[in-house]
Amino acid sequence: MATPHINAQVGDFAETVLMPGDPLRAKFIAENFLEDVTQVCDVRNMFGYTGTYKGKKVSVMGHGMGIPSCCIYVHELIAEFGVKNIIRVGSCGAVHDDVKLMDVVIGMGASTDSKVNRIRFNNHDFAAIADFGLLETAVAQARKLNVPVKVGNVFSADLFYSPETDLFDKMEKLGILGVDMEAAGIYRVAADLGAKALTILTVSDHIKRGEKLSSEDRQKSFNDMMTVALETAIKL
């Protein structure tokens, strides 16, 4: 039945849901990548859709910005609607010298400055990691599609405009590839509820070098990321 944040019914969602932050991006994915699409929810304009990709049922839904927002939607999708696999599809700002604009980054693990995971783990650190099966499948599909990917740790930040600019140097030293705002929270919720999760990101800007994609290049890199995510989804 419907929840306070998702006005859908059990069975409306596929077992695998792709989740961008922007609900309009979810709409774009549904209209441009899926077939036989049905809109299944729209509370607070957080749109969700279910359709097919190459004949297999797939859903897509926005999750908003930041760990508190995404955790609400991920929790309800898994706990109330029986979703088994969450694949976040979004963008990140690179901090590592080996990462270039338009690269696809797959978050094997996610560090964070958020306290949300510690609150849910008796104030201990939680190792927020992707499901290995999803990770392995995504890497294999990327290689098959000749899409260059970087696999490693990302950093899920609470602040978009952070005053701690020196932290980026520390991130690079520790091998962190890029910064998003949700992966660590999604991984924790999925682990808590016995589901699987993965984060696939496209590099839209390089924080340390001050580089940014043009709108045209941003769309191309997004399409590459989405193809990897969808090809992964239909293998599950």
Swiss-Prot record:
Which Pfam families does its entry note?
Answer: PNP_UDP_1
Where on the tree of life does the source sit, at the highest rank? Bacteria
Q: Name one GO molecular function term.
A: purine-nucleoside phosphorylase activity
Q: Where along this sequence does the record place binding of phosphate?
A: G21, R25, R44, R88, V89, G90, S91
- Quickly give the catalysed reaction: a purine D-ribonucleoside + phosphate = a purine nucleobase + alpha-D-ribose 1-phosphate; a purine 2'-deoxy-D-ribonucleoside + phosphate = a purine nucleobase + 2-deoxy-alpha-D-ribose 1-phosphate
Quote a single Gene Ontology cellular component term.
Answer: cytosol
Q: What does the record give as the active site?
A: D205 (proton donor)
Query: Site positions for Important for catalytic activity, renumbered to this chain?
Result: R218
Q: Which EC numbers does the record give? A: 2.4.2.1
Q: Name one GO biological process term.
A: purine nucleoside catabolic process
- What is the enzyme's main class? transferase
Q: Which residues are involved in binding a purine D-ribonucleoside?
A: H5, D180, M181, E182, S204, D205
Q: Which CDD domains match?
A: PNP_EcPNPI-like
Keywords on record: Glycosyltransferase, Transferase
Signal sequence annotation: none
Which PANTHER family does the record associate with it? FI09636P-RELATED (PTHR43691:SF11), URIDINE PHOSPHORYLASE (PTHR43691)
> So what family is this one in?
Belongs to the PNP/UDP phosphorylase family.
Record text on subunit structure and interactions: Homohexamer; trimer of homodimers.
Role of this protein: Catalyzes the reversible phosphorolytic breakdown of the N-glycosidic bond in the beta-(deoxy)ribonucleoside molecules, with the formation of the corresponding free purine bases and pentose-1-phosphate.
Alphabetical list of NCBIfam families matching this protein: deoD (TIGR00107), PRK05819.1 (NF004489), PRK13374.1 (NF009914)
Q: Specify the protein name.
A: Purine nucleoside phosphorylase DeoD-type
